[in-house]
Curated annotation (Swiss-Prot):
It comes from Prochlorococcus marinus (strain MIT 9211). PANTHER family: PHOTOSYSTEM I REACTION CENTER SUBUNIT XI, CHLOROPLASTIC. GO terms for biological process: photosynthesis. The keyword Iron-sulfur does not apply. Keywords: Membrane, Photosynthesis, Photosystem I, Thylakoid, Transmembrane, Transmembrane helix. Belongs to the PsaL family. It is a multi-pass membrane protein. The chain crosses the membrane at residues 81-101, 108-128, 165-185. It is found in: Cellular thylakoid membrane. This is Photosystem I reaction center subunit XI. One of its GO terms (cellular component) is plasma membrane-derived thylakoid membrane. HAMAP family: PSI_PsaL.
């Protein structure tokens, strides 16, 4: 056997497929399922943004375009309020349940203060994003987001988004703190705290 010969071929002859595996109705010029699932560039092939079945599928486009950041018809302040409320609400749990004070009576309050601190840090980063004096980077339309919000990518829009994010983040953290402090969750809280117990 030579070094260029395929070891899976018998005696160097090409493999012959059985007729039952060959579909004779498909012609080479037909546009079929292979072309439908082919990966193509969105606009400029040198940018590196490719249109794949994942990012151009119906479910992905519907999900991404309904997120508060890309949803059409809402103001930048309301976008920031929704995004901040989700961040504040979701960050509260890990800070309260896995923080250093998780086994004390101050676990819920420490989680609240930690979450508000994290929201302040994220808000400071949003402020620093436009601090050099230029407008935020405008995202061009692509196969997933066909109409990105133009009012968000201005200095005024980004400032409104940042203030809404701060208010929503602090409000989401306070709401999660109030929810975890109710009597209805008193039976569940020791179980959740016991999952991450160190001792």
């Amino acid at each position: 056997m030579t070094e260029f010969q395929d070891p899976f071929l018998k005696s160097g002859e090409p493999v012959k497929f059985d007729k039952k595996y060959i579909d004779s109705t498909i012609r080479p010029g037909d546009i079929g399922i292979a072309d439908q699932w082919a990966v193509k560039p969105v606009s400029d092939p040198f940018v590196g943004n490719l249109e794949t079945p994942v990012n151009s599928g119906y479910f992905t486009k519907a999900f991404i375009n309904n997120l508060p950041f890309y949803r059409s018809g809402i103001s930048p302040n309301f976008r920031g309020l929704e995004v901040g409320a989700a961040f504040g609400y979701l960050l509260y749990g890990p800070f309260a349940m896995t923080g250093p004070l998780r086994n004390t009576d101050f676990a819920l309050t420490a989680g609240l203060l930690s979450t508000i601190g994290a929201v302040h840090i994220l808000t400071a980063l949003f402020v620093l994003y436009t601090a050099p004096g230029k407008d935020p980077n405008v995202q061009p339309s692509d196969c997933t987001v066909e109409n990105p919000p133009t009012d968000l990518f201005t200095r005024t829009g980004w400032t409104d988004f940042t203030s809404g994010f701060w208010l929503g983040g602090c409000g989401g953290a306070v709401f999660a703190w109030l929810l975890c402090g109710t009597l209805h969750l008193d039976t569940i809280m020791p179980i959740v705290k016991g999952v991450w117990a160190a001792g």
